[in-house]
């Protein structure tokens, strides 16, 4: 007989960012070069001052006179694409003081403007760069070393893993980004996903795109492509995070925004929800019935919609009676968006059904 689920579930484990992994491995490799000591663990200081000890998978000299160290990325209980990946650093000592960063295998290179890293640079974000620089500077001072460090950061299978992220669309080619602002991955915080939404908007703006489309998934992206012929750089994969798009446009506005999603997702936005995930919002069938009434639905039809099992069934009932429920939902969703984005942004909403057909539009 299966044990009962405990009433108080265990707290979710936090993990460490790729930036923390890069800091730990680069420090361990550099310490081996300066002291001859290979470590099993390495202590680092996170951006907010926490001290953590990170276990290493290896720390060894290389044939070219340098050293390398690696660690297995532990994202805790967060569903992170890099969880379990080997993050490693290869370090060489150089005469010129300071730290030079390079993209090792599995780490991408920036090819488009709009990201916090210059075009042509390895996709190692500012905070991880600062963490590595500070740790290496402290190590050099401790051992009286006046030279510099050449640091290549890599991720095993990073190029394949990157295809599961937004990096290709952002113009980061060849692999993953080394990320993190606090050094810690908090379970289900989705901070990396939201950051990639913001970066997508930044890249579009920096490359002269004036019309972006924020879409909940692949089907909505396909619908937008077919309708407008927008390039990939103009498509923002917002998933469930409509609020992340709308709020960011307050400080990084564009001339035109198209919001496109499945009918059910868009009905949640229309009801005022900015997080469209089922954990945080649900379909309001009584509200859909009320809106159907606004569009001319009879009392009987409203009752049927109220009793529907799903939003798709509610939509099918409305369409069967020639009630444009999709348009009404789009109108309410547009109103919610308009209340958040700057006045100069032209907002359009599109709703699609399960087959990807447009069932509602408000320009």
From Swiss-Prot:
Keywords: Cobalamin biosynthesis, Methyltransferase, S-adenosyl-L-methionine, Transferase. It holds the Pfam family CbiD. Gene3D superfamilies: CbiD-like. It comes from the Bacteria. Its EC number is 2.1.1.195. Transmembrane segments: none annotated. InterPro entries: CbiD (IPR002748), CbiD_sf (IPR036074). It catalyses: Co-precorrin-5B + S-adenosyl-L-methionine = Co-precorrin-6A + S-adenosyl-L-homocysteine. Disulfide bonds: none annotated. GO terms for biological process: anaerobic cobalamin biosynthetic process; methylation. It is an enzyme of class 2 (transferase). GO terms for molecular function: cobalt-precorrin-5B C1-methyltransferase activity. Pathway: Cofactor biosynthesis; adenosylcobalamin biosynthesis; cob(II)yrinate a,c-diamide from sirohydrochlorin (anaerobic route): step 6/10. Belongs to the CbiD family. HAMAP family: CbiD (MF_00787). This is Cobalt-precorrin-5B C(1)-methyltransferase. It comes from Burkholderia mallei (strain ATCC 23344). The gene is cbiD.
């Amino acid at each position: 007989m299966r044990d009962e689920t405990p009433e108080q579930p265990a707290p979710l484990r936090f993990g460490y960012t790729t930036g923390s992994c890069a800091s730990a491995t680069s420090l361990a490799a550099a310490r081996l070069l300066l002291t001859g000591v290979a470590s099993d663990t390495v202590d680092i200081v996170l951006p907010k001052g926490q001290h953590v000890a990170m276990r290493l998978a290896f720390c060894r000299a290389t044939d070219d006179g340098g050293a390398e160290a690696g660690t297995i990325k532990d994202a805790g209980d967060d569903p992170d694409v890099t969880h379990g990946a080997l993050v490693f650093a290869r370090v060489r000592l150089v005469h010129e003081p300071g730290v030079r960063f390079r993209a090792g295998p599995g780490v991408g290179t920036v090819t488009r403007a709009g990201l916090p890293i210059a075009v042509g640079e390895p996709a190692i974000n500012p905070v991880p760069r600062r963490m590595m620089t500070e740790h290496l500077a402290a190590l050099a001072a401790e051992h009286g070393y006046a030279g510099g460090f050449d640091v290549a950061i890599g991720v095993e299978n990073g190029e394949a893993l990157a295809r599961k992220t937004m990096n290709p669309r952002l113009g980061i080619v060849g692999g993953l980004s080394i990320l993190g602002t606090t050094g810690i991955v908090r379970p289900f915080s989705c901070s990396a996903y939201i950051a990639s939404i913001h970066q997508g908007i930044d890249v579009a703006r920096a490359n002269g795109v004036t019309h972006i489309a924020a879409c909940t998934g692949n089907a909505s992206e396909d619908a937008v492509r077919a309708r407008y012929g927008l390039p990939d750089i103009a498509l923002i994969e917002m998933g469930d995070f409509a609020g992340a798009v709308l709020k960011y446009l307050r400080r990084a506005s564009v001339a035109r925004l198209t919001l496109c999603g499945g009918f059910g997702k868009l009905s949640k936005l229309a009801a005022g929800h900015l997080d469209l995930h089922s954990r945080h919002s649900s379909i309001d069938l009584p509200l859909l019935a009320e809106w159907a009434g606004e569009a001319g639905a009879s009392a009987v039809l409203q009752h049927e919609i109220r009793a529907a099992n799903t939003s798709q069934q509610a939509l099918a009932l409305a369409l069967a009676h020639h009630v444009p429920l999709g348009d009404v939902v789009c109108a309410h969703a547009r109103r919610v968006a308009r209340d958040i984005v700057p006045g100069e942004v032209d907002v359009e909403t599109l709703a699609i059904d399960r087959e990807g057909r447009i069932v509602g539009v408000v320009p």
